């Protein structure tokens, strides 16, 4: 019967937190090419106010930016060939979709905080 190697055996890997920061930087650079910087700043501020400077906040920001960029590219970004049908312009406004997603996240956060405050009173 074979034994499993210990977790610290094997090739060295990059520390998780460094990898998360690198991925976030790459996504941020790409998002700045496609979305309004003021909108991205508002999203970053919301995540920071909610999670502080934590890996959990960085992970949430990564998930939101990945989804926003995927939808943007899928809809036919002028800088990308992903999802683009030649001769057809996308009629969707992806900045408006991203704004709605951010607004939904903020409303959901406020509702969670409000329910916690009301439950705490009792």
Swiss-Prot record:
GO terms for biological process: symbiont entry into host cell; viral penetration into host nucleus. GO terms for cellular component: host cell; host cell nucleus; virion component. Its main location: virion. InterPro entries: RetroV_VpR/X (IPR000012). It is found in: Virion; Host nucleus. Pfam families: VPR. It comes from the Viruses. Keywords: Activator, AIDS, Cell cycle, Host nucleus, Host-virus interaction, Phosphoprotein, Transcription, Transcription regulation, Viral penetration into host nucleus, Virion, Virus entry into host cell. The modification Phosphoserine is found at residue 80. Signal peptide: none annotated. This is a macaque isolate. Stimulates gene expression driven by the HIV-2 LTR. Prevents infected cells from undergoing mitosis and proliferating, by inducing arrest or delay in the G2 phase of the cell cycle. Cell cycle arrest creates a favorable environment for maximizing viral expression and production. Interacts with human UNG. This is Protein Vpr. It comes from Simian immunodeficiency virus (isolate K78).
């Amino acid at each position: 019967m074979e034994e499993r190697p210990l977790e610290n055996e094997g090739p060295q890997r990059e520390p998780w937190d460094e990898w998360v920061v690198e991925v976030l930087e790459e996504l941020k650079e790409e998002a700045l090419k496609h979305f309004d910087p003021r909108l991205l700043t508002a999203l970053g501020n919301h995540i920071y106010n909610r999670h502080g400077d934590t890996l959990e906040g960085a992970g949430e920001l990564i998930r939101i930016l990945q989804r926003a960029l995927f939808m943007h590219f899928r809809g036919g970004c002028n800088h990308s060939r992903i999802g683009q049908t030649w001769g057809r312009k996308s009629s969707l406004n992806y900045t408006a979709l991203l704004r709605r997603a951010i607004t939904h996240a903020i409303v959901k956060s406020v509702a969670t905080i409000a329910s916690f405050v009301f439950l705490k009173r009792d």
